[in-house]
A protein has these predicted regions:
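Histidine-centered catalytic micro-motifs
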Residues: 2-13, 165-174
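Glycine-enriched alpha-helix->loop->beta-strand junction motifs that scaffold or abut catalytic
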Residues: 88, 156-165, 197-200, 217-226, ...
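Active-site gating loops and adjacent loop-to-helix segments of metal-dependent hydrolytic enzymes
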Residues: 14-45, 72, 100-116, 173-201, ...
Length: 386
């Protein structure tokens, strides 16, 4: 089955390999001023590049968490949806948000935060783009250190009224834990419970620093987790307790996260990475190759609450990823599925989304990779020059 990406930031393809030795907060503070120059043309180029890279790695469904809305700039989420439609990939887009700026104790600069009414009104407007198959919409305040308690509460109320899911970053770093304890007097998961988000219509990205009680709370309430192993290692955040979450019965899928904190939009690479970090944490039997592959397919579908994708069964969407197994890296392998996972990243040979070809012979069907890359370089240069 096609891979399912449960956490991404498409716009970040424009800012790869920056703040190379930074932790999360330093990395964000370095890049916030750059992202504040984002416009619709840049976003479209970034989305095309990011979605193309994901498709070539075998990904058929992408959740994108877009939370940067520079003042006066419109059409950013629509640009992502347009790019996904043109390439043929399924997208679950989001109306992310930040309303807690530096002057009020938040991390982002005041120039990148919006007011509550603007956020909620635009979220409701974008909800009309959702359909049952190719486009989904999620309500997604950014993080405890960039949004107010009121926005968390009112976002949940709006999402539930509209029948939409909720998503946020949570428990990614020790610095976030310290921030929540200082500002709210509780841990990130306790804060999530306080604002009414510990529920089955919620999934959270990262969840690296969870206690045993947190794991039990997520499993018991149905909160899903987007595991982003490469990004978490790149920023020195740590390793999520995925084996504990799975043993407790929690929903877990994989995410690339932004390609500014991962540098590769390759979801299949995350399958192997998930296996490696699980074994590094829990030993050689902590996660099998097939269990890791399940995280990237059926696990992701479960996190997104999609029962029509994630596996190849009668009645489900024909989301199919096909890899060749006659290359040098497969020589001597008896278990081809395990070797596909253990030998790492591979360009997909064919990719179908809902039965429609998106990749054929290792090349995009609906666009030229060279043209996407050239336009992306042009827009990245515009962003940095601005």
């Amino acid at each position: 089955p096609g891979l399912v990406n449960t956490h991404h930031h498409l716009y970040q393809t424009l800012t790869r390999a920056r703040a190379q030795e930074a932790d999360l907060f330093t990395w964000l503070k370095t890049l916030y001023p750059v992202w504040a120059r984002l416009d619709e043309e840049m976003e479209y180029a970034a989305a095309r590049a990011g979605l193309a890279e994901l498709a070539l790695s075998g990904c058929t469904t992408v959740f994108d968490h877009h939370y940067v809305f520079p003042r006066g700039v419109t059409g950013l989420v629509e640009a992502e949806i347009r790019a996904a439609h043109e390439l043929g990939v399924r997208i679950v887009a989001s109306r992310g948000s930040m309303d807690l700026g530096e002057s009020d104790g938040g991390l982002p600069p005041d120039s990148l935060v919006e007011d509550l009414d603007t956020i909620l009104a635009d979220t409701e407007r974008l909800a009309a783009f959702a359909n049952d198959d190719r486009v989904g919409i999620v309500v997604a305040p950014c993080s405890p250190f960039s949004v107010t308690t009121r926005l968390m509460e009112e976002s949940a109320e709006l999402a539930r009224r509209l029948g939409l899911q909720l998503h946020t970053h949570l428990a990614e770093t020790r610095e976030e834990d310290a921030y929540c304890r200082e500002l709210f007097g509780c841990t990130p998961v306790e804060y999530l419970e306080r604002v009414g988000w510990v529920a089955e219509d919620v999934w959270c990205a990262h969840c690296v620093h969870l206690s045993d009680a947190d794991v039990a709370a997520f499993a018991g309430s149905g909160v899903g987790v987007a595991h982003c192993p490469t990004s978490n290692l790149r920023l020195g955040a740590g390793v999520a307790p995925v084996r504990d979450l799975l043993d407790a019965g929690a929903r877990v899928g994989l995410g690339v996260d932004g390609t500014a904190s991962n540098e590769r939009g390759d979801l299949f690479a995350e399958v192997k990475q998930a296996l490696l970090v699980a074994r590094g944490r829990g030993g050689g039997e902590a996660l099998t190759a097939r269990a890791a592959l399940r995280l990237g397919t059926r696990g992701g579908a479960e996190v997104l609450r999609r029962d029509d994708i994630g596996s190849l069964e009668p009645g489900k969407r024909a989301d199919v990823a096909i890899w060749r197994t006659d290359g040098l890296e497969f020589g001597g392998a008896e278990d081809l599925v395990a070797n596909l996972v253990l030998s790492g990243s591979h360009r997909v040979d064919r990719l179908l989304v809902g039965g429609d070809e998106v990749v054929r012979g290792g090349a995009l069907v609906h666009a030229r990779e060279e043209e996407i890359a050239a336009e992306h370089r042009k827009q990245a240069a515009r962003l940095w020059k601005a």
